[in-house]
């Protein structure tokens, strides 16, 4: 069994459902220390974070990943135990195989190989891991970034091991992500009998024109390689369950995925103004998950495009699609950020898996990226 495959299996066997780490980072730190890395454990709240560095000074290249996984769901739905890694027909199955214990294992192996071959490399190679990526992401990289700001820690380049490939390893290079902003709108009315609407105020009827305007609005036409900003209603609830009662309150949850054309305060102001025009009696709670980030043409992007093209046999698609990642907390530090990882077809699903051949190729891919950035 190859080194990366063995380490991936060891990590999968640790049931690190967010925010638990289940000893993953301790095992990784032991290996990185043996390779000459300095390791710092940053426990913030209930979350484990690991900051490991080799070398000194600029440029600083960070390999960013997470050791937590989403819950497996009903175990009887899996072909095999989600935390008992199994290889069948050249495919490794287990929770976290693709998202993202395979990438984390590949980071470790690539880092070990790189510093063994280039012990006096230029700049700093760092590995940053958290156990709070799949959950609320409050005490993970978000908090670590605050610590870095206080210390004056700079980062030049960041490679996140998120499963970015679509069909074959290296066919997509993630160069940015949209921002994410969620809102919970509560519209107040007056409860009453449906036969006497004049004695009540139906919050569904009152809010309907405003909601229609919200969902019909075209926020922008996209930005660079970003798709247009999108607002989606995700949950609507009102009423007691009885069909003869006008509800006294309506609650609507919604989410915006937005381009760098916007920021969260401007979007919040726009939506508040729209609701005010409709003279609603309402409250609105916001949750800012992260601002958008975008890595323009530069050394990191050009090197990654070149390396992925070599490994995949064709230039990668360069995309800003998908959800959010922890790179959104590193980019504001001034870092150029990209995401490179295995095929994402099975992430968060029953029988999550990664092709063994892809997993075994990942360390060489990451090591090549590191060498072209830190070896002059």
Curated annotation (Swiss-Prot):
Keywords: Amino-acid biosynthesis, Cobalt, Diaminopimelate biosynthesis, Hydrolase, Lysine biosynthesis, Metal-binding, Zinc. Its cofactor is Zn(2+); Co(2+). This is Succinyl-diaminopimelate desuccinylase. Catalyzes the hydrolysis of N-succinyl-L,L-diaminopimelic acid (SDAP), forming succinate and LL-2,6-diaminopimelate (DAP), an intermediate involved in the bacterial biosynthesis of lysine and meso-diaminopimelic acid, an essential component of bacterial cell walls. It catalyses: N-succinyl-(2S,6S)-2,6-diaminopimelate + H2O = (2S,6S)-2,6-diaminopimelate + succinate. Homodimer. GO terms for biological process: diaminopimelate biosynthetic process; L-arginine biosynthetic process; lysine biosynthetic process via diaminopimelate. Pfam families: M20_dimer, Peptidase_M20. It comes from Xanthomonas euvesicatoria pv. vesicatoria (strain 85-10) (Xanthomonas campestris pv. vesicatoria). Binds 2 Zn(2+) or Co(2+) ions per subunit. Zn(2+) 2 binds at residues 99, 134, 348.
């Amino acid at each position: 069994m190859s080194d990366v495959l063995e380490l991936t299996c060891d990590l999968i066997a640790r049931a690190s459902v967010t925010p638990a780490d289940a000893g993953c980072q301790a095992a990784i730190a032991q290996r990185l220390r043996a390779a000459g890395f300095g390791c710092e454990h940053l426990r913030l709240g209930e979350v484990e974070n690991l900051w490991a560095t080799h070398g000194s000074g600029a440029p600083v290249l960070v390999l960013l990943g997470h050791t937590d996984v989403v819950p497996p769901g009903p175990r009887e739905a899996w072909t095999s135990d989600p935390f008992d890694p199994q290889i069948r027909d050249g495919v490794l199955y287990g929770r976290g195989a693709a998202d993202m214990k395979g990438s984390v294992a590949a980071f470790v192996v690539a880092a070990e190989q790189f510093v063994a071959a280039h012990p006096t490399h230029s700049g700093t190679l760092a590995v940053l891991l958290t156990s709070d990526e799949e959950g609320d992401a409050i005490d993970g990289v978000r908090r670590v970034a605050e610590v870095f700001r206080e210390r004056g820690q700079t980062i030049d380049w960041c490679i996140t091991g998120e499963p970015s490939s679509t069909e074959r390893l290296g066919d997509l290079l993630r160069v940015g992500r949209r921002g994410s902003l969620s809102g919970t709108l509560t519209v107040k009315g007056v409860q009453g009998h449906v036969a006497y609407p004049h004695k009540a105020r139906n919050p569904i009827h009152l809010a309907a024109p405003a909601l229609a305007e919200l969902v019909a609005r075209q926020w922008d036409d996209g930005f660079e390689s970003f798709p247009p900003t999108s607002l989606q209603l995700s949950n609507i609830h009102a009423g007691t369950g009885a069909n003869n009662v006008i509800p006294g309150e309506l609650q609507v949850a919604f989410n915006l995925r937005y381009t760098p054309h916007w920021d969260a305060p401007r979007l919040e102001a726009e939506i508040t103004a729209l609701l005010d025009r409709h003279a609603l009696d309402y409250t609105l709670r916001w949750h800012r998950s992260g601002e958008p980030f975008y890595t323009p043409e530069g050394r990191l992007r050009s090197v990654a495009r070149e390396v992925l093209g070599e490994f995949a046999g064709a230039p990668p698609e360069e995309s800003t699609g998908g959800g959010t990642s922890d790179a959104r907390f590193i980019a504001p530090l001034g870092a150029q950020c990209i995401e490179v990882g295995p095929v994402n077809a099975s992430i968060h699903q029953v029988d999550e898996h990664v092709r063994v051949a892809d997993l075994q190729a990942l360390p060489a891919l990451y090591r090549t990226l590191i060498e072209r950035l830190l070896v002059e």
